Amino acid sequence: MELEFLGTGAGSPSKSRNVSAVALKLLDEIKKIWLFDVGEGTQHQILNTTIRPRKIDKIFITHMHGDHIFGLPGFLSSRSFQGGEKMGPLTIYGPKGISDFVNISLKVSQTKLSYELNFVELEEEGLLLENDRFKVYAYKLDHRIECWGYRIEEKDYPGELQVEKLREAKAPSGPIYGRLKAGEVVTLEDGRTIDGKDFIGKAKKGRIVTILGDTRQTPNLKLLAKDADVLVHESTFGKGEGKLARNYHHSTCVQAATLAKEVGVKQLLLTHISARYVGKMVKVLEKEAKKVFPNTKVVKDFDTFNIPFPERKDDEQ
């Protein structure tokens, strides 16, 4: 599981930062990639990575501001050209209006897609989707227009079958191991009964990634970010600009760091950086946040972060 940032700027592109887009790479887990926001130029950014558009099967849009959606029509069109009929379906999740924006853009440009395109427009907060490996939750944020944050929870991995322990118990190898790993109670040929649950190691705890759209401080942030292994939070303003952040419905680096500290986040990644912050000023943002939450980084375009499995606490073992 990796995060790769395709755009980390705020509002409009600059020489050093493109506008918002981040890829959650789940290639080892489900052989897929999920995109969060698709600002203008995202497909150009993808060309500078190893990301293959055919691997992207879900796109999550936080809100309808242009710096988060203007790259969608071009990306969808190029995805069609690159894969033809072999391209699998793609689903876009986002606020009301996202389907109109995409469909009208494709219609007026007479763009025909070679793959199935589906939309899920968000209405209710809570569980958005669930598959064998992940749950995704969506909750409203506090921005000038409807805006959402996403919490991706990986399900726990089942423990490994303890083969050495089975050998010590003189349990015969073979198909019986499969039944024991499934947690069944098995009767052996010698009449003994063994419970598979006694021969399975501890489960490996799944990871949690929280990706937020533009927002000022709101109670839902704690709900979204609690115990996250990685929190991706906007940082449009610096420490001394709290009033500006409030007025423009954005956040400061210190507000993001305070949230991370309060809810047990493991790592904080700050994005949506204003073009006013360049060179040494970026380091100032990071330094301000680190005073509150040390494991903080201001990200730049093409930064990639591996998300390790969390260590279990003693009371979870």
UniProtKB/Swiss-Prot annotation:
Coiled coil: none annotated. InterPro entries: Metallo-B-lactamas (IPR001279), RibonucZ/Hydroxyglut_hydro (IPR036866), RNase_Z/BN (IPR013471). Keywords: Endonuclease, Hydrolase, Metal-binding, Nuclease, tRNA processing, Zinc. It is an enzyme of class 3 (hydrolase). Its EC number is 3.1.26.11. It catalyses: Endonucleolytic cleavage of RNA, removing extra 3' nucleotides from tRNA precursor, generating 3' termini of tRNAs. A 3'-hydroxy group is left at the tRNA terminus and a 5'-phosphoryl group is left at the trailer molecule. Binds 2 Zn(2+) ions. Homodimer. This is Ribonuclease Z. The lineage of its organism: Bacteria, Bacillati, Bacillota, Bacilli, Lactobacillales.
